[in-house]
């Protein structure tokens, strides 16, 4: 009974330890996985896919008899979460148990329904759900109307599902019938491809068993140049998706000419719109082209133009990766550090923020000044998404009885790269980078090189395949390099698998397989020929390559040619014989492995030559108005770059088989002259090779090495994504003393260089029997960047073996704008690296991201990615970062993650002081410098791409350090786990070495795209956090009435300024208004003012009030008095102006009387005679005399004479006389006349 509790505790401790160890693997184990662990998941891909997908993996399974059940068990194990609900529903402290359970049940229903809906569409309809469809099925599932099994039944019985099955069956039957025509090959010679399932077809593409076995199997016969059977595969339709958008352009005026597609305005606006908007789509996987459908006048207002355009995506390129990322994001509740897929823009196909992604990109281009158009992001609408079928003829499969040529159909390689994508259920991610359809900005190009030789088999096949895939805007405008397969004889002893993937920058983003290059190796030369493809209908004239004699070779072509160049079968030997030749040389018996970069020598002869390269420009798929026959080889040397630097790569290996290394890139040239130098081999008739294409010319000479050494190491060289360099390669043999001389010259020349003060390589010896794993890291995993200090170069190590005369000289011609070449070595018992490699955590796929705002030292592009795997010790590794041209014309930015990572930690054995709030204080600066000195070297040595560290602030709570890390390259969203483990290890190291106690449980790490910057600003309750939407910077802003002094937390003005309110006033904070003062109030006095600075008394107020009233009364009285006086003066002046004597008065008086009579109703009958007298009548009355003969001072006779002298008639005169008599005799009538006079006045 006593031992039982103890045993239970021990068991619980062991269980917790197992859980923790399961979720937090060590960094070293995660970074350097063994080859078997890396390649096991790839073998398991076949049984996780449909049954038809596993047919082509039979060859792999024959060579790798793995335990299927064991592998399946390891594959299907899902990792436990390290903590409770790390990415799911959180438990809030204020929640009750019932609420927490209800929330978790609700979250569980949502997650299950999401999975069910996604899987139903994926399984039965093989497409993505629309927004309405998704919400419809989600509502049915969440409401319990339809169960997940009923949902599957409904989907399986749908018409769309049945038509999809019929279409798949039809394609499968055509494939089987076509595969029966291929010639049989012995099964025993089937080569396995490094435990990688290469034959997994795309979900929308049928399996090609016949093509795969024809390309993977090789009979044991002698090498020959004869080509016999040519089999054309069946035509299969490839899916395309067309998304139609509409957007409103501001600042453009609609005109009728825009309706005519042939008008100048329509074409000009169309070209301008496509060039601007295309940047938002080029980073998306599967993007092919964009075209404008029409321009419309806006409905709401007359300003601007509505543009309707369609974007075409390749369904083959996005379907598989899209589904994987759908499952990945829908399963994010179980996301952990081992599943590390970059968050590519493929996600926007499956998440509702697709519109926001495009709109944000367009808006950023306009705000940054990169766009002349002003699109309205709110007006962007996704109108329709439809799928179309395009017919594409499969590549020709060349079958030769002599097994000298075995071409791999590019569809197989395409399926290989698609299969290399881990699905959403993967818990182990391979370190070998698959073809990432969304990692390169505009497009991706895959290459595969493998070599397999079973024990006892003396035939080793080196296959170099280039399934080039490019996008088109018009049919003849894409250059394609075809699959290349080389065979050679070697005493193969060691079985090695060398899967490699590569990508190159091109104009289009969709993936089109076209053309197959067929190569034959004879005794003295190799022949290359490109086969015609039916996907391009317009032929392009071939350019003639002059002979390779004692003069420089100039190659002319057209910079406007970007289509593939078809060759006829009749030119198989005539045109290619001058292009590619391999000379046999007999090497010495000693073995040596060297890697030497010569910074100033041009060819294998060790002599300086004038190699001229042209700067590559971004490929454009637009048609050119200039003729195709215009040569790009001109004599204008002013267009040449200012500085040219040749890089010579000397590879001396202990390989006994023929090393075939080939490189081809697709670019569009500027109009610049290009000359290739004369290649003079040291011994033997080695002749350079010029690949006849319109996009790149490269000189290549491949010697055939024959050695008696029994040991074999098979290596493959693969180009990495985003290659921007022209390469001239020559191969020859030389003796070891010349190699030493070249090495010395390299060191002298590089040491004397003033522009680049760094070494190309250092040489150290390793055991000759050691087999190494060569890996060229991408730029984000470089050991360091260019520096002017030679002291930092002590970490650069180059591995080499004892000397041998088997050498392959590679002369790489590049521009001088290059990042440094860095080489590091990992031995069994010693690790010598400048940076601890956590590439699996930070940048697994190996993509690099170009930031235009960075300085020149940060603009370098990774030039190549070489990963060669063997079946030997996985810890023996040589890492090489090849330099490439950091072109200034690059403008692609891929946003797979953030450039910033926030983290905070708590130091428990240090006391906080108020001075740590002030960033200008000595204590703050001292503590900041201490943490920078501790953290920066540690982070720089453990984090790839680490740029700088910024201490944001110190906060109380012992001491809480909030920091922000910046990276030179974007990091994956799930980088938090890696940073967390590194900081956790730092906490332990700091406590053991510096007595700095850091609480591990206080670590908080968030990436910049997911983090809340305000969280790390620690704004208090008196402030708010504001985030700059463009820079992402956060700052605290105090509320009104609060103030931050010396960057301390916001405090009240009442506390900071005790004398804010005077005269004993009370300070108070009014929310939204700020600080106010509440002043004192007495019985008959009080204080007032903003700061209570004014004294007010009641008697004074009363006196002022009385005085004010009296003053107003006086003012009103004065105004009234002056108004009355003014009226009187006006009246008197009017009276003085009116005369009283003379004859002039009488007519007026008479007229007034007449007017009065006129308006008197008593005298209506007499109005007509009074109309002509309208003058004012004086205010003086007529005075009647005693006699009736005198009226108004005039006698009747005088009045009669006055009227008679006028023009009045007799009747009128008599009437007026009667009126006058009435006026004189009737007082009332006289008063009436006077009233009329006053009114007239």
Curated annotation (Swiss-Prot):
Tissue specificity: Expressed in the retina (at protein level). Expressed by photoreceptors of the interphotoreceptor matrix (IPM) surrounding both rods and cones (at protein level). IPM occupies the subretinal space between the apices of the retinal pigment epithelium and the neural retina. Expressed in the pineal gland (at protein level).
Gene it is expressed from: IMPG2
Entry-linked SUPFAM superfamilies: SEA domain
Membrane topology note: Single-pass type I membrane protein
Region (Hyaluronan-binding motif involved in chondroitin sulfate A- and C-binding motif): 1210-1218
Stretches assigned to the Extracellular side: 23-1099
Organism: Homo sapiens
Biological processes annotated in GO: extracellular matrix organization; protein localization; retina morphogenesis in camera-type eye; visual perception
InterPro entries linked: EGF-like_dom, IMPG, SEA_dom, SEA_dom_sf
Compartment(s) of residence: Photoreceptor outer segment membrane; Photoreceptor inner segment membrane; Secreted, Extracellular space, Extracellular matrix, Interphotoreceptor matrix
Composition bias, Basic and acidic residues: 660-678
PTM text: Highly glycosylated (N- and O-linked carbohydrates).
Lineage: Eukaryota, Metazoa, Chordata, Craniata, Vertebrata
Domain EGF-like: 1010-1051, 1052-1093
Origin superkingdom: Eukaryota
Outcome when changing residue 379 to P: Found in a patient with retinitis pigmentosa; uncertain significance
Glycan attachment residues as annotated in the record: 154, 190, 192, 301, 320, 370, 544, 556, 942, 956
Transmembrane segments: 1100-1120
Disulphide bonds in the chain: 1014-1025, 1019-1036, 1038-1050, 1054-1067, 1061-1077, 1079-1092
UniProt domain SEA: residue ranges: 239-353, 897-1010
Name of this chain's protein: Interphotoreceptor matrix proteoglycan 2
UniProt-listed SMART domains: SEA
Chain intervals for the UniProt region annotation (Disordered): 180-223, 660-684
Positions of the UniProt region annotated as Hyaluronan-binding motif involved in chondroitin sulfate C-binding: 1080-1088, 1136-1145
GO CC entries: cell projection; extracellular matrix; extracellular region; interphotoreceptor matrix; membrane; receptor complex
Region annotation Hyaluronan-binding motif involved in chondroitin sulfate A- and C-binding: where it falls in the sequence: 1125-1133
């Amino acid at each position: 009974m006593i031992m039982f509790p103890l045993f239970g505790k021990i068991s619980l401790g062991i269980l917790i330890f197992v859980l923790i160890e399961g979720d937090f693997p060590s960094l070293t184990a995660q970074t350097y996985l063994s080859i078997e662990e890396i390649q096991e998941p790839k073998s398991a891909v076949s049984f996780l896919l449909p049954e038809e997908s596993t047919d082509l993996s039979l060859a792999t399974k024959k060579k790798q008899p793995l335990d299927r059940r064991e592998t399946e068990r390891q594959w299907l194990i899902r990792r436990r979460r390290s903590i409770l609900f790390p990415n799911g529903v959180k438990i809030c402290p204020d929640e009750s148990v019932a609420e927490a359970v209800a929330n978790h049940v609700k979250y569980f229903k949502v997650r299950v329904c999401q999975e069910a809906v996604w899987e139903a569409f994926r399984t039965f309809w093989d497409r993505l759900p629309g927004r309405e469809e998704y919400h419809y099925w989600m509502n049915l599932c969440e409401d319990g109307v339809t169960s997940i099994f009923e949902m599957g039944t409904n989907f399986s019985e749908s018409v769309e599902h049945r038509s999809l099955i019929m279409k798949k069956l039809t394609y499968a039957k055509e494939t089987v019938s076509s595969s029966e025509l291929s010639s049989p090959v012995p099964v025993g010679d089937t080569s396995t491809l490094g435990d990688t399932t290469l034959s997994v077809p795309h979900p929308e593409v049928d399996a090609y068993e016949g093509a795969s076995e024809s390309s993977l199997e090789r009979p044991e016969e002698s090498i020959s140049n004869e080509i016999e059977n040519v089999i054309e595969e069946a035509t299969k339709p490839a899916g395309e998706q067309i998304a139609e958008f509409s957007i409103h352009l501001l600042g453009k005026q609609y005109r009728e000419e825009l309706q005519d597609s042939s008008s100048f305005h329509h074409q000009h606006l169309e070209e301008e719109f496509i060039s601007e908007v295309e940047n938002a789509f080029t980073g998306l996987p599967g993007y092919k082209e964009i075209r404008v459908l029409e321009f419309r006048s806006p409905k709401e207002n007359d300003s601007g133009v509505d543009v309707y355009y369609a974007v075409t995506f390749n369904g083959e390129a996005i379907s598989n990766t899209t589904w994987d990322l759908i499952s990945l994001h829908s399963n994010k509740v179980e996301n952990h550090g081992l599943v590390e897929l970059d968050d590519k823009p493929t996600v926007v196909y499956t998440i509702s923020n697709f519109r926001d992604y495009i709109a944000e990109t367009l808006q950023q281009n306009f705000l940054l000044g990169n766009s002349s158009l002003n699109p309205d992001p709110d007006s962007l609408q996704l109108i329709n998404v439809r799928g179309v079928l395009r017919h594409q003829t499969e590549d020709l499969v060349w079958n030769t009885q002599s097994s000298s040529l075995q071409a791999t159909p590019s569809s197989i390689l395409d399926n290989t790269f698609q299969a290399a994508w881990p699905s959403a259920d993967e818990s182990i991610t391979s370190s070998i980078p698959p073809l990432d359809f969304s990692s390169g900005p505009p497009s991706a190009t895959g290459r595969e090189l493998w070599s397999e030789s079973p024990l006892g088999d003396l035939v080793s096949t080196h296959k170099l395949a280039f399934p080039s895939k490019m996008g088109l805007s018009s049919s003849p405008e894409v250059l394609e390099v075809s699959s290349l397969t080389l065979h050679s004889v070697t005493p193969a002893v060691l079985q090695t698998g060398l899967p490699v993937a590569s990508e190159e920058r091109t104009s289009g983003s969709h993936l089109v397989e076209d053309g197959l290059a067929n190569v034959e190796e004879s005794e003295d030369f190799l022949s290359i020929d490109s086969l015609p493809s039916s996907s391009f209908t317009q032929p392009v004239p071939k350019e003639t390559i002059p002979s390779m004699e004692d003069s420089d070779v100039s190659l002319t072509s057209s910079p406007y040619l970007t289509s593939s160049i078809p060759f006829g079968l009749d030119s198989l030997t005539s045109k290619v014989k001058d292009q590619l030749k391999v000379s046999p040389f007999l090497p010495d018996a000693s073995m040596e492995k060297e890697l030497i970069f010569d910074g100033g020598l041009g060819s294998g002869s060790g002599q300086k030559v004038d190699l001229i390269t042209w700067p590559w420009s971004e490929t454009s798929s637009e048609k050119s108005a200039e003729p195709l026959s215009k040569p790009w080889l001109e004599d204008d040397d002013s267009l040449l770059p200012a500085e040219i630097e040749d890089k010579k790569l000397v590879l001396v290996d202990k390989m006994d088989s023929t090393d075939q290394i080939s490189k081809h890139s697709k670019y569009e040239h500027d109009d610049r002259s290009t000359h290739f130098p004369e290649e003079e081999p040291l011994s033997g008739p080695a002749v350079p090779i010029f690949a006849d294409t319109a996009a790149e010319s490269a000189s290549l000479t491949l010697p055939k090495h024959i050695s008696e050494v029994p040991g074999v190491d098979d290596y493959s060289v693969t180009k990495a994504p985003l290659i921007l360099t022209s390469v001239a390669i020559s191969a020859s043999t030389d003796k070891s003393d010349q190699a030493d001389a070249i090495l010395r010259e390299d060191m002298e020349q590089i040491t004397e260089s003033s522009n680049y003060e760094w070494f190309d390589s250092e040489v150290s010896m390793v055991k000759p029997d050691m087999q190494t794993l060569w890996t060229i890291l991408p730029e984000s995993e470089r050991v360091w960047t260019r520096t002017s200090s030679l002291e930092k170069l002590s970490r650069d190590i180059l591995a080499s073996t004892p000397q041998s005369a088997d050498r392959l000289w590679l002369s790489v011609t590049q521009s001088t704008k290059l990042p440094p070449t860095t080489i590091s070595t990992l031995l069994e018992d010693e690790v010598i690296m400048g940076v601890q490699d956590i590439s699996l955590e930070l940048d697994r796929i190996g993509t690099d991201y170009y930031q235009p705002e960075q300085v020149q030292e940060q603009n370098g592009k990774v030039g190549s990615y070489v990963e060669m795997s063997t079946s030997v010790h996985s810890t023996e590794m040589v890492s090489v970062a090849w330099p490439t041209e950091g072109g200034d014309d690059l403008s692609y930015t891929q946003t797979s993650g953030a450039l910033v990572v926030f983290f905070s930690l708590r130091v428990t054995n240090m006391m906080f002081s108020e001075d740590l709030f002030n960033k200008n204080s000595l204590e703050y600066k001292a503590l900041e410098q201490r943490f920078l000195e501790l953290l920066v070297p540690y982070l720089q040595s453990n984090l790839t791409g680490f740029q700088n560290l910024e201490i944001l602030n110190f906060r109380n709570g012992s001491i809480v350090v909030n920091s922000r890390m910046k990276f030179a390259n974007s990091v994956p969203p799930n980088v938090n786990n890696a940073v967390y483990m590194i900081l956790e290890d730092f906490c332990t190291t700091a406590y053991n070495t510096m007595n700095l106690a850091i609480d591990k449980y206080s670590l908080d790490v968030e990436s910049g795209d997911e983090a809340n910057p305000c969280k790390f600003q620690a704004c208090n309750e008196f402030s708010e956090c504001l985030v700059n939407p463009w820079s992402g910077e956060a700052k605290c802003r105090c509320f009104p009435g609060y103030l931050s002094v010396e960057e301390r937390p916001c405090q009240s003005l009442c506390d900071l300024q005790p004398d804010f309110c005077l005269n004993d006033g009370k300070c108070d904070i009014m929310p939204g208004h700020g600080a106010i003062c509440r002043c004192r109030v007495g019985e008959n006095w009080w204080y007032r003012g903003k700061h209570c600075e004014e004294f007010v008394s009641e008697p004074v107020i009363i006196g002022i009030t009385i005085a004010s009233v009296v003053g107003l009364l006086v003012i009103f009285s004065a105004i009234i008095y002056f108004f009355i006086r003014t009226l009187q003066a006006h009246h008197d002046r009017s009276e003085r102006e009116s005369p009283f004597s003379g004859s002039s008065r009488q007519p007026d008086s008479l007229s007034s009387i007449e007017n009065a009579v006129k308006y008197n109703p008593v005298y209506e009958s007499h109005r007509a005679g009074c109309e002509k007298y309208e003058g004012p009548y004086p205010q003086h009355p007529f005075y009647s005399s005693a006699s009736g003969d005198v009226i108004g001072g005039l006698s009747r006779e005088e009045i009669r004479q006055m009227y008679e002298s006028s023009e009045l008639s007799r009747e009128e005169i008599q009437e007026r006389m009667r009126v006058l008599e009435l006026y004189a005799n009737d007082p009332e009538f006289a008063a009436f006349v006077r009233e009329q006079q006053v009114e007239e006045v």
